[in-house]
Amino acid sequence: MIKQRIIYNGSYFSRKPNGISVVSRELAKSINPNLITLLAPFSDNQCNFHKIPENLSPDNGLYSHARRLFWNQFHLGNYLKKESDSILFSPLPEAPIFRGIKSVVLVHDLLPLRIPYLTPLLPYHIFYVPIVLKNASKIICNSLATANEVHEKLNISHKKIEVIKLGFNRGTLRPLKRVKENFFLIIARHTPHKNIPRILKAFYNLRRFNKSMKDLRLKIVGQYDKRYTPSYKKLCSNLGIDNCCDWIYWVSEKEKLELLNSCQALIIASLWEGFGLPALEAMACGTLVVASNRGALPEVLDCNGILIDPDNISSIESGMKRALDNKLLSEKLRKTGPLIAKKFCWNNTAKQIEEIISEI
């Protein structure tokens, strides 16, 4: 039984959620509302809600990260000092870094420590996140791969780490009776570790060497990033595939449901994933996933999908071709995918978090 009030850090809430912001909002809706006070820019009908500034949200661009860190350190820190019998739950590794505050923090990955690339947020990952995790009362990881990474890279004891399964939106993501259309789907941010250039080259090779696939299309769903998107689109143009690649910068849950049910397969060729929520969402729709053999993706797929080497363009191309050719596998996963996805439930995730907090 939880004896202390949970202060829920909802500063990462987004009105167009993806990735961590999806997790943030879904967990806030699933944890027992009688146990938490939600601090967020808006509420999904939570009863104990304390409004915070809207400009902390990732919807407000790069500077929102700096504003949110300042808010975490000072405003959230002062709030927690006043609520001395409370414990902070943060659905991402952000919390006041001074000691004396009890916190439980959810970690999704330590990607920038594994695959460093030039980003203004690199110091955040190298210096700030490790301090937050070392100060935390408990660390929750979304996969065994992430838990091992936290242990190995930050020298944090496994005794401090708990592994839980995330969930997906069962209300909106499900199999539909749709005829498969002639396209592959990517749902990913336009950052280097998502490996989009290699996918584009593999797609080009697939169409080039298989005349029967000239009508095949690629739909890329992900927020425009001025650092990387222009170069990806230029690569499309150089390869001569810009007329068969559709760049979609955001979709609603209803649109995502249609895309996941209509595509031949979801392609996730990431260099590393701490979890891989789109893979789970695709399985929930009974859709085949062609996925990287790195990070947590093999855990999520549980031998149900096609694994590829993300460093090897030929391997990605081969995985795509198998997805088109192996109709038996596609039919099998139409049935087994939703059954596997049922193991992942936000309510179960929330109950596990409540149990972890109750033991502190």
Question: Which role does the model predict for each range below?
Answer:
Residues 1-360:
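Carbohydrate transferase catalytic cores enriched for Leloir-type hexosyltransferases
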